[in-house]
Amino acid sequence: MTGGGRAALALQPRGRLWPLLAVLAAVAGCVRAAMDECADEGGRPQRCMPEFVNAAFNVTVVATNTCGTPPEEYCVQTGVTGVTKSCHLCDAGQQHLQHGAAFLTDYNNQADTTWWQSQTMLAGVQYPNSINLTLHLGKAFDITYVRLKFHTSRPESFAIYKRTREDGPWIPYQYYSGSCENTYSKANRGFIRTGGDEQQALCTDEFSDISPLTGGNVAFSTLEGRPSAYNFDNSPVLQEWVTATDIRVTLNRLNTFGDEVFNEPKVLKSYYYAISDFAVGGRCKCNGHASECVKNEFDKLMCNCKHNTYGVDCEKCLPFFNDRPWRRATAESASESLPCDCNGRSQECYFDPELYRSTGHGGHCTNCRDNTDGAKCERCRENFFRLGNTEACSPCHCSPVGSLSTQCDSYGRCSCKPGVMGDKCDRCQPGFHSLTEAGCRPCSCDLRGSTDECNVETGRCVCKDNVEGFNCERCKPGFFNLESSNPKGCTPCFCFGHSSVCTNAVGYSVYDISSTFQIDEDGWRVEQRDGSEASLEWSSDRQDIAVISDSYFPRYFIAPVKFLGNQVLSYGQNLSFSFRVDRRDTRLSAEDLVLEGAGLRVSVPLIAQGNSYPSETTVKYIFRLHEATDYPWRPALSPFEFQKLLNNLTSIKIRGTYSERTAGYLDDVTLQSARPGPGVPATWVESCTCPVGYGGQFCETCLPGYRRETPSLGPYSPCVLCTCNGHSETCDPETGVCDCRDNTAGPHCEKCSDGYYGDSTLGTSSDCQPCPCPGGSSCAIVPKTKEVVCTHCPTGTAGKRCELCDDGYFGDPLGSNGPVRLCRPCQCNDNIDPNAVGNCNRLTGECLKCIYNTAGFYCDRCKEGFFGNPLAPNPADKCKACACNPYGTVQQQSSCNPVTGQCQCLPHVSGRDCGTCDPGYYNLQSGQGCERCDCHALGSTNGQCDIRTGQCECQPGITGQHCERCETNHFGFGPEGCKPCDCHHEGSLSLQCKDDGRCECREGFVGNRCDQCEENYFYNRSWPGCQECPACYRLVKDKAAEHRVKLQELESLIANLGTGDDMVTDQAFEDRLKEAEREVTDLLREAQEVKDVDQNLMDRLQRVNSSLHSQISRLQNIRNTIEETGILAERARSRVESTEQLIEIASRELEKAKMAAANVSITQPESTGEPNNMTLLAEEARRLAERHKQEADDIVRVAKTANETSAEAYNLLLRTLAGENQTALEIEELNRKYEQAKNISQDLEKQAARVHEEAKRAGDKAVEIYASVAQLTPVDSEALENEANKIKKEAADLDRLIDQKLKDYEDLREDMRGKEHEVKNLLEKGKAEQQTADQLLARADAAKALAEEAAKKGRSTLQEANDILNNLKDFDRRVNDNKTAAEEALRRIPAINRTIAEANEKTREAQLALGNAAADATEAKNKAHEAERIASAVQKNATSTKADAERTFGEVTDLDNEVNGMLRQLEEAENELKRKQDDADQDMMMAGMASQAAQEAELNARKAKNSVSSLLSQLNNLLDQLGQLDTVDLNKLNEIEGSLNKAKDEMKASDLDRKVSDLESEARKQEAAIMDYNRDIAEIIKDIHNLEDIKKTLPTGCFNTPSIEKP
């Protein structure tokens, strides 16, 4: 059974509670099924609730008082006077004796009852001291009942409070008291009338009887007595009333039999609070929008919300469900939150009350997408437009300067001012600048040097690359010849790189180098791509030359010599020719026109520079010889490199064939140049201003006395002065080599010839003399001593005459110290620095410079203070430092065992380096060994101590270095440590107790802790300590002793009361009792009559009230800062506390007076039965006095509550006004009012002092004062609270206004964020479009290069490219073509196999050519896979396809460049290695043969050339169409993709992949052979260079030379 179920069974309601709970139970049974689900069977929302539970079950209750700490005795109340009570021990430290708060909410087992218990009345548990039991539910619950089961008698007075939020105030729920009016100022068993305040707490004495003594129940129903309980769904007041997050039970007063007044300890121990069960029945509050509560990630309870709500209690609508206000679900309506209608353009909205009132829909959309606006995002924002109702709104972006209006038309076009253009009127028209309110002004640019455009802001012209000036009217430094036809504007100075200053040369005219073929072929010839000759045909009829191709490989027209050589004067000019083909089946390449020279090579496709495709009609092609990007020569060269190429032009190649078995016809070839002489001026020829040492028009020669600094560079080399050191007057102007004499040598006569020594740089004929060395070996002169020494001694020897061992060697080569010993290397076990000098003794071989911490004759041991293996190969594994700890080592030795490294340790010291003490020892720093810790066996925790101080680790409360004694103010030394004495600082003579824990008390104090006053002593706050009561109280003490004796007799009589058979009647006793009642009644009447006696005090209080009202009216316009008002409030609070202390003193004096009155002697009758009757009379009088005291206490409580309420209202007012501006006048006025209040407060203190004195004289006067003070409360608290609420309301309105402004700001910010995002997108789109435009020509060229490469690489690549185009343009027709092409490829596989076999037979003889063919085949397959990948990607992302295509084009171009680079490297190797010329020629011949043999393998590739013209145009269209694939028929595309996959499967079935793989394998073998060949060439070149360097360093004669290995 759950906790909630047990609680329900345990609750037995009675009285009015039972009918209401019965009704609620019936209703719950009817709707149980409905409450479980938040939607009915049809999916319609309905009210749902979590299950009914005991919310308190196993929830921790916080109790402010619990017995057992320290252990204490309590007695069970029997209710029979005189009977010996059963006493027990409450000890929180023992499980079976503890009664903690956890027992309040555990399982309530009737057979084994557990309960919470407070301390007894002996410990001060009684009114006015209260105990709070606080239950934190964790979240809001709808509370049905609160039930308490008491283990002792129910309290006389207790209250139940609740909080509706965890940080909110405590609200009274219900009061239970036998004195409702006096204790809680509530009417007993009051009720709520219809229309009354249904959130008020009631009070009843129904459960305040002292019986039963155990097991009494108190059940509080939250809806009992509430008129609207049966209309709960429509009562927000009761919905708030049953809501609680916390429940608090405040126990105010115990129920007693009255015998506690005699302070008998055993009696006091029998009075205490004890509760066995604390149950709270209810449901997790979810407002009808959830059927369960769950724990979140923070282990907090919250509702599992439905109906589009959220929040801990489902108290809010989800962010997008604000179409109507949130409501609590009812039985009639689920009140689910409805979504906002934003037309699909927003996911955010808020509830707009005004919109809801006007339209019935309150969802106001925010952050509308697509630049829309309106409550439902139904219209475009201002200055936006859209073409259709379903389209997104686009910003007009009309320029505020260039447009006539910021609003555009329905197409987004703005109205522009004069000279302004663009849809947005944001830029000047071409040729205009300086956009202003009046429009744009025209530019004034020099058309020769500008693009006819100028800066739209400043009017500064946009110059060509090599032009400068505001109007682009002059060339930049280093450039000349400003002309409009030059895309760069000016031509860079060439001058062979020696000068950057040049001008237009005078005397040059235009000259055309041409071939018209009127007589013959004019020296032109034809080559194949591999360089082999091919036939050329000259037609006398057509007067042109032709070439016919019988294979796929292209053939080139080769220009004659007159077009070659120094053609630098053609830089920037045109090369033109007329060309046609016999059929349009053409496939272009990136090398249709090739220029070579000076080690450089450039090429362009035939259609570059705006030329058209070749056709049957003769077309004139014009190519500008310039490096600008407008003329895409590849690779790109710098201006200097391009002119360098033309300065030594070695080859012009024009491609003649573009497909298999086609012919190409060439005519009218013209190269524009210049020459000296009359004619049309050639302004592009330069005349350089040369620096010193240079001559010639172009600075191409060195003047006399100068030479080339780098002869191999020719005219490009700088000119420097000849350097011959005085041994020659002439030098070669090109190489700079001097014609030396006087036994000198070197290019500059900078050294003596072999066998001679001296300084040839002195410039005399006797600079070089013969060497004095035997055998004529080379020698040198020591600069300082001028001594001649030999320079080529044998290895290991040294000295002026090679008579000594060299450094690093030892021996006696001349036998000067004994027998002859040859020089040998030093033997030091690799423990020396090979780069050091003097590692060993040159005579004995003793090692002198051992490293790695080694020593010994051969560095074969570790030196002192180190250990390890000196012969280890790794230096890190050799000798390491001992690093002995000087404090733990015998005599502080630094040495150790040379092998193990163990140091010699002192006693009780351990570790290799003697750095630690043995366990249980310390003080290593003493240097005498470690000392024993000697920790006390009981006082220490583990016997260990601090290794430095020796301090042991002690048990709690124990101290001393060895843990041998208790700490100060502790006792009980033992294994668990020492316990604190805890002596009271005022009552004990010393804070140190005795061995048994008892403290020595001062006079008047008693108790183990000296924390209680002795009998007939009292505690005085103003004078700390227990003071003896006045002498008159001794009589009271004596009387108390007498009464104790009488009380014992009375208890004895009561115990024997039931043993007699007859009842005793005593008329005298009854009369006396009535007289006592009359006296007490008169006393009460007099106390009530004197309430209005002190009119002076009431007048003062009235003035205080008036003053406070005046302050309230002034404070409505005052706004204080928190700091100032906090100081004032603190001072007022101090005054209130002082007044409370005075009232408390008066209360104690009243208590003393009451006790004295209770002890007044009453004359006893002489009758035998009278003693018993008189005792009863005294008891009755005591009860009356107790009741009067209770009334006085109630008056005090009311006064105190009024004071606190006034202080709270005042503080609330101050907090409400915090943060506002405050003027100096208002501060002064407030200070004045405060001084008045302070004076009044001082008067109140004086009045309270007077009350104190009167209370000492008579208790009745104290009652009068308390009653007067109680009348202060209603006036001040209500007025202050009303004013505070008014100002609080104003602050709340201001907060709502601020929230609205913040919301508007957030809306504006989100709107601007959307605009920013749109602007960024437009900028990115503009950049992308600009890049696309900039790269358009490059893409076209790349497309052409791809087409030519596809034709060259094989039929499969072109077929895949055609598949892509067919899939995009003509799906149905292209499917059949794909299938036919695949079958064609299958039929040609045998021809490929035959070609592979023939190529394999000639592999060794034609490595280069076959390697190229294999590479082509590999690339063919790669391109096929690449095309397949691109086709797949096009279906997903058109932009990715374009990027892949561009990257593929770049890879093809790079591949061609790499092949060309390899060819150039081979040519260089052939030039440098003349002895292999014949082999190279043979290789070229074999390559030609291999090419012939490989033609059959490439027949399929040539067939693909038939459709090259249409392919090129289609590819150009493809670039435009790839960005417009939004309307592609995906179904059709998927169908075509299936057909394509089917065709691929058929190709795979033909085993083409395996055959291509075999070809790839063979290609890899050939590539490896080529790489080996290249490596051999590189090594040979290095060897040659090495030999040349050696030759330069050798003297003319050598008498002791080692053999040189030949390359």
From Swiss-Prot:
PROSITE patterns: EGF_1, EGF_2, EGF_LAM_1, EGF_LAM_2, LAMININ_IVA, LAMININ_NTER. It comes from the Eukaryota. Gene3D superfamilies: Galactose-binding domain-like, Laminin. One of its GO terms (cellular component) is neuromuscular junction. GO terms for biological process: cell adhesion; cell migration; chromatin organization; extracellular matrix disassembly; gene expression; hair cell differentiation; hair follicle cell proliferation; hair follicle morphogenesis. InterPro entries: EGF-like_dom, Laminin/Netrin_ECM, Laminin_IV, Laminin_N, LE_dom, LMN_ATRN_NET-like_EGF. Its main location: secreted. The alpha-helical domains I and II are thought to interact with other laminin chains to form a coiled coil structure. Laminin is a complex glycoprotein, consisting of three different polypeptide chains (alpha, beta, gamma), which are bound to each other by disulfide bonds into a cross-shaped molecule comprising one long and three short arms with globules at each end. PANTHER family: LAMININ SUBUNIT GAMMA-1 (PTHR10574:SF270), NETRIN/LAMININ-RELATED (PTHR10574). This is Laminin subunit gamma-1. It comes from Mus musculus (Mouse). The gene is Lamc1.
